[in-house]
């Protein structure tokens, strides 16, 4: 039994869902998202409530059921509220700045790293050491934030690098002398 799949999704005011042969389009105040779901899963819309129903209890359907519901919920939340990932930089001389839609990072390399914003993603730099990635598609926001973090992930001795706000980086002890 999929506990997540059986939960009902409540659509907030201003969000509208259209189902065209399991190609779901969700429109809201922040934008529009379209995604194709498995043909065997049935998506029912009753007023402001969305339910996801699987045809049988086979192992394949059970695995798809919860995932479909979670993806659909992320679409509804994305077009109504949006998603945001915050990153922080630790290290001497580590800086971030915006040049148009491009994010330019100085992270201790001989060159600067430039990250082009994917479609639907906006970067915000509040101060030179903090970056915000915002958008309506949760997957793209997460992938973009993970890519930025991968350019200089935190090292385990001093913790220098790019990390998520609130991320705990376990520090190792250095070498001990004789």
Swiss-Prot record:
PROSITE patterns: RIBOSOMAL_L6_1 (PS00525). One of its GO terms (molecular function) is structural constituent of ribosome. It comes from the Bacteria. Keywords: Ribonucleoprotein, Ribosomal protein, RNA-binding, rRNA-binding. One of its GO terms (cellular component) is cytosolic large ribosomal subunit. GO terms for biological process: cytoplasmic translation. Gene3D superfamilies: Ribosomal protein L6, alpha-beta domain. This protein binds to the 23S rRNA, and is important in its secondary structure. It is located near the subunit interface in the base of the L7/L12 stalk, and near the tRNA binding site of the peptidyltransferase center. Part of the 50S ribosomal subunit. Belongs to the universal ribosomal protein uL6 family. This is Large ribosomal subunit protein uL6. The lineage of its organism: Bacteria, Bacillati, Bacillota, Bacilli, Lactobacillales.
């Amino acid at each position: 039994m999929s506990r997540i799949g059986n939960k009902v999704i409540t659509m907030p005011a201003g969000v509208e869902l259209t189902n065209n042969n399991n190609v779901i389009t969700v429109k809201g105040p922040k934008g529009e998202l379209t995604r194709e779901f498995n043909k065997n899963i049935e998506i029912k819309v009753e007023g402001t409530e969305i339910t996801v129903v699987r045809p049988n209890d086979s192992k394949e359907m059970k695995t798809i059921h919860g995932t479909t519901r979670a993806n659909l919920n992320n679409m509804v939340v994305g077009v109504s509220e949006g998603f945001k990932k915050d990153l922080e930089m630790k290290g001497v001389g580590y800086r971030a700045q915006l040049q148009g839609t491009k994010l330019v990072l100085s992270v201790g390399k001989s060159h600067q790293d430039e990250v082009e914003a994917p479609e639907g993603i906006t970067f915000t730099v509040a101060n030179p050491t903090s970056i915000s990635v915002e958008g309506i598609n949760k997957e793209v926001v997460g992938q973009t934030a993970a890519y930025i973090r991968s350019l200089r992930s935190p090292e385990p001795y001093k913790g220098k690098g790019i990390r998520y706000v609130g991320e705990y980086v376990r520090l190792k002890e250095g070498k001990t002398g004789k």
